[in-house]
Amino acid sequence: MAKIKLLSIDGNFAKELEVTSDLFVEVPHKQAMFDSVLAENAAERQGTHSTLTKGEVRGGGKKPWRQKHTGKARTGSTRNPHWTGGGVVFGPKPNRNYNLKVNAKVRLLAFKSALTIKLNEGKMLGLVANSDLETPSTKKMVNFINNANLENQKVLLVIADHFSNIKKSTNNLQKVTTKLWYQVSVRDLMHANVVVVAEEAFTNYARKVSK
């Protein structure tokens, strides 16, 4: 069992939470993490890039100069690839799929590895259950960050489904990223300096890995 410090919505220490060791690994698997982040980055590529081939470039239908007796190399079109403004050989075309396949077990191993790294570094905190604000308030979330000594740090706040007011309250906080527990990726965990996980999210994660 791993022990996580839980904070109240005021940013002060509330209690300790014992989290199942099934959420962590003994040794983080760097290759699994690399593959997962690479696949996530690749999936965001639009694949809409396009270049013109020799047959698609406008102009150049006329032979630039006669074949012989000019002292120049022979050429038939200004659309040839070696000409400035000519076509591109084997250039990218639209609708390319950059998606990379990562097995579910590898993705889970990568996620556990990222959680383990944050835990070992002391960069993982918790948020006590039922901590959602009554109404959206950016000021209260700023107080939470300040009281928890998280100023000037990139914070990933992992919340449960019903924490809608906290989500709205952090929209204007530049260094705070708030995501629902099932939206968090390995890249999100590695990019953040500190990860704050709601107590309900820990419960959901534990239920997920136990299946």
From Swiss-Prot:
- Segments of this protein annotated with the region Disordered: 44-90
Tell me the organism.
Ureaplasma urealyticum serovar 10 (strain ATCC 33699 / Western)
Q: What does this protein do?
A: One of the primary rRNA binding proteins, this protein initially binds near the 5'-end of the 23S rRNA. It is important during the early stages of 50S assembly. It makes multiple contacts with different domains of the 23S rRNA in the assembled 50S subunit and ribosome.
Keywords attached to this Swiss-Prot or TrEMBL record, sorted alphabetically, are: Ribonucleoprotein, Ribosomal protein, RNA-binding, rRNA-binding
* Cited InterPro entries: Ribosomal_uL4 (IPR002136), Ribosomal_uL4-like (IPR013005), Ribosomal_uL4_dom_sf (IPR023574)
Entry GO MF terms? rRNA binding; structural constituent of ribosome
Task: Tell me the protein's name.
Answer: Large ribosomal subunit protein uL4
Q: Where is the composition biased (Basic residues)?
A: 60-72
Query: What interactions and quaternary structure are annotated?
Result: Part of the 50S ribosomal subunit.
Q: Which family does it belong to?
A: Belongs to the universal ribosomal protein uL4 family.
Q: Which GO terms describe its biological process?
A: translation
Origin, by domain of life? Bacteria
PANTHER family, per the entry: 50S RIBOSOMAL PROTEIN L4 (PTHR10746), LARGE RIBOSOMAL SUBUNIT PROTEIN UL4M (PTHR10746:SF6)
Give the classification, highest ranks: Bacteria, Bacillati, Mycoplasmatota, Mycoplasmoidales, Mycoplasmoidaceae
Q: Which GO terms describe its cellular component?
A: ribonucleoprotein complex; ribosome
Which NCBIfam families has this protein been placed in? rplD_bact (TIGR03953)
Q: Does the keyword Nucleotide-binding apply?
A: no
**Pfam families the UniProt entry points to:** Ribosomal_L4
